[in-house]
Design a protein with these regions (language model features):
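Signature of N-terminal electron-transfer/Fe-S-associated modules in redox systems
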Residues: 1-153
Length: 153
């Protein structure tokens, strides 16, 4: 089975196709930005992009990404190793505290901004409705996404 994860081609042996995708990414590829939160696709901690769409993968298996392009938070950085402008905006606007929800929030926002380069605050809120944060509240997160949207134009 073949897939692309963070812009790199991966061949995955058949014996791993039934493995939970979160386990494969975390344990086999050391992509620990993918979190196991609620295990019910409700909190957004397990969010990644699959073919540029946000997917909650806590119930997915490796076979679900065959021939797909997968992006985790580790694949967001720029080619020179610096943070993506959206990641930097989360830092600059104080949208990170404990960090558990941050990868899912950033990837959900990235998918939104890829499809809508100038979302309204209400559109940002709606996009984040399945991402839970217990620390920051959402004001700083929305501010960060709004500020970063200029980099998507």
């Amino acid at each position: 089975m073949q897939t692309t994860i963070n812009k790199k081609a991966h061949y995955i042996p058949d014996e791993l196709k039934e493995l939970k995708l979160t386990e494969y990414l975390r344990e086999h590829l050391n992509l620990t930005g993918v979190k196991n939160g609620c295990e019910m696709r409700s909190c957004g901690a397990c969010a990644v992009l699959i073919d540029n769409k946000t997917m909650r993968i806590c119930h997915s298996t490796v076979k679900d990404i065959e021939n797909c392009e997968v992006l985790t938070i580790e694949g967001m950085e720029n080619e020179d190793g610096t943070l993506h402008p959206l990641q930097q905006a989360f830092i600059d606007y104080g949208a990170i505290q404990c960090g558990f929800c941050t990868p899912g929030m950033v990837l959900t926002a990235h998918a939104l901004l890829l499809s809508n380069h100038a979302p309204t605050r209400e559109q940002i809120r709606k996009a984040l409705q399945s991402n839970l944060c217990r620390c920051t509240g959402y004001q700083q997160i929305i501010d960060a996404i709004e500020a970063a949207s200029v980099y998507y134009k």
